[in-house]
Amino acid sequence: MNRVFNVTCLSALMASLVLADGPKDNQSAEVRPIPPPGIPVPEQEANALKTGLAALRTAIDAAAKAQSKNPMLPDLLPDVEIYHKAVDWALRYNEVFKPAELKAAAELLAEGMTRASQLAAGQTPWTKQTGLVVRAYRSKIDGSIQPYGMVIPGNYSGAPSRLDTWFHGRGETLSELSFLDQRRKQVGQISPANTLVLHPYGRYSCANKLAGEIDLFEALAHAAKFYNIDTNRIVVRGFSMGGAATWQFAANYADKWCAATPGAGFSETPEFLKVFQNEDVYAAPWYQQKLWHWYNATDNALNFIHLPTIAYSGEKDRQKQAADAMEAALRGENMDLLHLIGPGMEHKLHPDSLAEIERRLVDIVRVGRAEMPYEVHFTTYFLRYNHMHWVVVDELEQHWERTRVHAKMVTDSAVEVKTQNVAALTLDVSAGHSPLSPLKRPTVKIDGQEVSVSRPRSDRSWRVHLRKTDGKWQETLRAFENDGLVKKHGLQGPIDDAFMDAFLMVQPSKAGWNPKVDEWVKLEADRALFEWRRQFRGDAMVKADTAVTDADIAANNLVLWGDPQSNALIARVLEKLPIKWTQQMLTANGKDYAAGSHAPVLIFPNPLNPAKYVVINSSFTYREYDYLNNARQVAKLPDWAVIDLTKPRTSQGPGGIADAGFFGEHWEWKKN
């Protein structure tokens, strides 16, 4: 295919997809469904596809049985199952969006049957295939099958290879069926020479946030089992919504990639919505404005010192705002953004600009990712993102405030560190990489204080834990002083964080104390399952409270619906939760509420397994109104809230918010 034609046509397609939103989608009382309803499927074609689905299901089961002793079966079976899911869900959930997709569905069933037969015979030729390859994995989050696409160069020989990821644009009709059809037929907007390209599905159209963020890492881990990926030469790339994804992956994981090439999209929430939606969100509650830090790349611009970045915008594209905002943020950190402008372009990639990006990437990739920079500069706002090269932030003084670490290897026995809002950190250099002398006891000068610390080990690794107590830094034997409650990486909240790892929805088996609360719980719990499927493309795992096992508690974040009367697990953990809850009264953060008309939502370390979360009465916290623009798809509730059930549930909230806030660093109540 002609390269320029390929780029131009696909860019135009992306433009038509992303511009589906706009100021007309600012009416929270008139929210159109995302994804939209599909077209009617003629009965004859529907029946033929259902027959094909039944045959494919039988073939998949036969292949699984035939290969039951194959240790690679868990990684191979999803490559077949995804064909069944794609067609099944399109029919089951009215997600056939155009007549051509019916032909594509038949093709997918045929391809799935071929793979099932091959797998049953112990053959997996698609794992050695070059060109366009559909792949899939089973997610740890909800057990769902999630697709991704690979583009394998014809000369790929198994040698360590550069890999580029390409994050797709907004696609309200991008079902699994549509995505698989694209990944079978379209190379996409990039195809660099001698480069593997991975196209994540990203859990549909969420700008690769939350579970969509984890999707990238699960897809990369699966791909690495079959392709020899050079981990020092991974490039994150995308355009439009995919450009937004690139900005956030670049900002929050700057030490993982070799380069980033974001195009258009958005790089933060409030200013983009002002420009693109004519929507002023600065009246949002204070805790929502704190939560913008999660995905605002502008707030974490310092991290780009570790990641070569090439931004692109069309000259006439309103989404040029994304790179303009990043340019200003980087300038504030004394960095100058390389921002290529496509002359005369609206929401499209200019072929000349793409060629310039590719030319520059060749030089960047030749150098590769820095494995052991002598200087590290890192900023974050919460401990989900707590790591940059050899600096690990273990505890904060206060979550959702700007946190910074500047660390430098000065000599072979001296390290300088400056911190802001850090209570404990670890300096952790992997084996073979420490530039410090193993013969000298090094000194860490941290915030002006000199601390004599442990020497590097004989394998040239070096790990030092430092903690600040009463304003004084000292080395400690481990990262955490005791086993008490503390906010740390993976256990820091907010509510939405629980849905980025394995979770189990636990439903009540009895009536609760108050009918109004029961009614609200039923509506919200049902909505949680419905919206998880629609927005994150999986069936959430569900059990009744009486069916939950010790193994479930060990393996999952528990999402408990109900009250202490209706849900036995809420009753079990209530004593060790910070709330007080009786039939008459709910007490949260020192305030009392009538239990008949209020309900708590919160996240907390699970008293039954403190390595996991317990969540009370909540799923992911953005709602239907937020689906209309990807920049709105950010966390809407903090660690806890009290819901006023006398106020209606809406497209923006589960009811009235009587109060809400974050827990302190030891999961204690704190004043808002």
Task: Name every feature range the model reports, one short phrase each.
Residues 171-183, 255-307:
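Mobile cap/lid helix-loop segments that gate and shape the active-site cleft of serine hydrolases
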Residues 306-313, 338-339:
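Catalytic His-Asp charge-relay segment
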